[in-house]
């Protein structure tokens, strides 16, 4: 079966939308198709007007002449409109502050995705200028809940780190019974639920159609960003800085969080300086958006409620877990991140 160019164009547009989410809009989609051998359309003076009205844009219509220049075989046209840095930062900030407001209104219990969501907000609060008052108020609620279930730390971030280490060890199957000996049975049960909820969320994304192609596109975008930043005179981010900022954190795993926080501070300082060129703002927008997309693939958008974990449903025991399947989205995304260095 032959696929028309208009369908190819639509497919490319949908892929772009899947990659950038609401960050793109597609217009001026057009294509052409070879005339069908059967049921040819015959144009007559009596029916030209009717056909133009009822078959406009139809794949078999020949009564309306092409308005665009003839395209080469396989060529498609799609206009992708990328949001400005200010618009992107505003939308991401609004998303995070709405999420924090939900946390502030609640005394718990919180799902693992809500707890991970708070970690993500803290990771980007400086660059996105998230309301610090809301960050602090939500942090108090999160810390109080963690203390209630038996997870403690000098700060809310430290307590969350302690929680995620336990969840990570369970998820990866590296935990030893003696290591969890001081945890109550209630906490052990809750940690298992957190682990299953995370796997359920990630399985949801690993089964998404086109996931591997999407990640391949992200790798390409990463490489292009390296070239664009290197071409700036002078540049303020090295290839190592960019790759460090795009390091996707697997919360609970051994990692150096200071790596991307340092780069976040560098970007923030640059944007706060006077007369930032438009081309630099555009590159920073691409960088921020790419990291957000990578995080969304692993943990879902901040504040979303349409996943298995959000509904309290864990992974089915008959279903291969996200962490155990080498071809899953997790293995692919971390493999691509490793290959970036």
From Swiss-Prot:
Cystine residue pairs: 26-307
Cellular compartment(s): Cell membrane; Secreted; Vesicle
Comp. bias (Polar residues): 60-75
Chain residue ranges for the region called Disordered: 36-75
Keywords: Cell membrane, Disulfide bond, Glycoprotein, GPI-anchor, Lipoprotein, Membrane, Merozoite, Palmitate, Secreted, Signal
Carbohydrate attachment residues: 23, 30
Keyword Membrane (UniProt): yes
Key word Membrane present: yes
Gene3D superfamilies named among the record's database cross-references: Glycosylphosphatidylinositol-anchored merozoite surface protein (1.10.4170.10)
Superkingdom of the source species: Eukaryota
Regions of compositional bias (Low complexity) in chain numbering: 49-59
Outcome after substituting residue 83 to A: No significant effects on erythrocyte binding
Post-translational modification: The signal sequence is cleaved.
Entries under InterPro entries matching the protein: Bd37_core, Bd37_core_sf
Note: Vaccinations with the recombinant proteins derived from Rouen 1987/Rouen87 or Weybridge 8843/W8843 strains protect gerbils against heterologous challenges with Rouen87, W8843, Y5, 6303E and 1705A isolates. Monoclonal antibodies MAbF4.2F8 raised against the protein derived from Rouen 1987/Rouen87 isolate protect against virulent challenges with Rouen87 and Weybridge 8843/W8843 isolates but not 6303E isolate.
Protein name as annotated: Adhesion protein Bd37
């Amino acid at each position: 079966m032959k696929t028309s160019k208009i369908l190819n164009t639509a497919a490319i547009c949908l892929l772009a939308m899947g990659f950038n989410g609401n960050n793109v809009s597609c217009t001026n989609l057009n294509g052409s198709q070879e005339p069908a051998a059967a049921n040819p359309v015959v144009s007559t003076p009596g029916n030209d007007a009717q056909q133009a009205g009822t078959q406009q844009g139809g794949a078999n219509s020949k009564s309306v002449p092409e308005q665009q220049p003839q395209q080469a075989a396989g060529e498609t046209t799609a206009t992708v409109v990328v949001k400005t840095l200010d618009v992107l930062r505003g939308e991401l900030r609004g998303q995070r502050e709405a999420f924090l407001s939900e946390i502030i209104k609640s005394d718990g219990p919180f799902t693992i995705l809500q707890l991970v969501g708070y970690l993500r907000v803290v990771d980007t609060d400086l660059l996105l200028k998230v309301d610090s008052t809301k960050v602090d108020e939500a942090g108090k609620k999160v810390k109080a809940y963690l203390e209630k279930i038996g997870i403690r730390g000098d700060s809310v971030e430290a307590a969350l780190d302690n929680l995620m280490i336990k969840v990570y060890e369970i998820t990866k199957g590296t935990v030893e019974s003696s290591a969890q000996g001081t945890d109550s049975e209630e906490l052990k049960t809750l940690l298992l639920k957190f682990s299953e909820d995370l796997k359920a969320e990630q399985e949801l994304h690993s089964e998404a159609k086109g996931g591997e192609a999407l990640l391949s596109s992200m790798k390409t975008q990463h490489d292009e960003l390296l070239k664009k930043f290197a071409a700036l005179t002078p540049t303020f981010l090295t290839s190592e800085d960019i790759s460090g900022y795009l390091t996707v954190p697997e919360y609970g795993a051994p990692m150096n969080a200071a790596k991307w926080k340092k780069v976040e501070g560098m970007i923030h300082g640059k944007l706060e300086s006077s007369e930032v060129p438009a081309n630099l703002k555009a590159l920073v927008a691409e960088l921020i958006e790419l990291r957000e997309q990578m995080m969304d693939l692993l943990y879902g958008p901040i504040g979303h409620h349409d996943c298995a974990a959000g509904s309290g449903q864990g992974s089915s025991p008959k279903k291969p877990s996200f962490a155990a399947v080498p071809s899953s989205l997790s293995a692919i995304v971390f493999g691509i991140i490793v290959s970036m260095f």
